[in-house]
Design a protein with these regions (language model features):
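Generic start-of-chain signal for non-secretory N-termini
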Residues: 1-26
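Short, helix-capping/interhelical loops that line the mouth of catalytic, cofactor-
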Residues: 1-9, 58-105
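Membrane-entry segments of alpha-helical transmembrane domains in multi-pass membrane proteins
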Residues: 6-10, 37-48, 98
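Alpha-helical transition-metal enzyme core signature, strongest for iron centers
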Residues: 14-21, 44-58, 80-87, 102-105
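Helix-loop segments that flank and shape redox-cofactor active sites
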Residues: 19-43, 60-69
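Glycine-/proline-rich flexible loop or hinge segments
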Residues: 32-42, 55, 87-94
Length: 105
């Protein structure tokens, strides 16, 4: 079943979620960006980028025929696609720094 969502309402919700995420990550730096390597947790820096990738992938790139097939950030699929990036490798990826990751949002 395909659900129709008003594009303006969706855009507003996505902006609100990014603003909320910005508040959550405001104090992250250094070791807090990667955190401990645990089987039940992703690195925070990876999760932040994954939020941007997820919104881009599902809301822009797969929204309609003719949507752009490639990510806006070169290599983003190889970094943030949780279906293809094994969990235990996410700490070792060449992730962008926090400022670049915030820009991706």
């Amino acid at each position: 079943m395909r659900v129709q969502i008003d594009p303006s309402a969706l855009a507003a919700e996505l902006r609100a979620s990014r603003a909320h995420l910005a508040k959550i990550i405001a104090g992250l730096d250094g070791d807090k960006l990667l955190g401990p390597k645990l089987t039940i947790v992703n690195p925070p820096l990876w999760e932040i980028g994954h939020v941007g990738w997820f919104q881009e992938f599902w809301c822009l790139r797969n929204s309609a025929p003719g949507a752009p097939p490639e990510p806006f950030v070169r290599g983003a699929d190889a970094l943030y696609n949780s279906a293809t990036v094994p969990h235990d490798t996410r700490w070792d990826l060449p992730l962008p720094d926090l400022d670049a990751t915030r820009s991706y949002l």
